Design a protein with these regions (language model features):
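Hydrophobic alpha-helical segments
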Residues: 1-155
Length: 155
């Protein structure tokens, strides 16, 4: 297996553009933990192990329980673990990430407008688009998560 490119080294302008999109998302009114939940779910769907690892740790640092992080992929079956807003965010994330299936459905979109308003819904859509782009970079360049054995060891 050959070593893949590092975008920051090879195409710094492209990397800077991605960082600018991240800066926009970071400055939105979306709750920080909600942003991490979006990032984890999209990364799971896209198979980006690096991003799943990174954002799972970020979510726990923000106060998410390990149980919540572990159940993100099974959020429908773990409805009692996630708030109504979190379930809506997860549904939006899946529909936008799997855009080739049906896209963001009208029912989901209208519920988002009702719950979050137009401005925040636009911010959420951009947050989902951003992590999907990062996931594609991560998968295409074969980014791998670091070993975190000490961090994950039971206490």
């Amino acid at each position: 297996m050959s070593k893949r490119i590092n975008f920051n080294d090879v195409q710094p302008n492209a990397y800077e553009a991605m960082e600018a999109l991240d800066k926009f998302v970071d400055e939105t009114s979306i709750d920080k933990l909600y942003r991490e939940i979006i990032k984890i779910r999209a990364s799971q769907i896209n198979g980006c192990a690096y991003c799943v690892d990174s954002h799972s740790h970020d979510a726990m640092r923000l106060g998410a329980s390990m149980q919540k992080v572990l159940l993100i992929s099974a959020w429908r079956e773990a409805r009692n673990i996630f708030s109504d807003e979190e379930r809506l965010l997860l549904r939006m994330t899946e529909e936008i990430t799997l855009i080739h299936q049906h896209g963001l459905g009208e029912e989901t979109y209208q519920k988002a407008i009702e719950v979050f308003g137009e401005g925040k819904t636009a911010q959420i859509i951009m947050a989902i688009i951003a992590i999907n782009a990062w996931n594609r970079i991560g998968v295409a360049t074969e980014l791998r998560p670091p070993h975190r054995r000490k961090e994950l060891a039971p206490h």
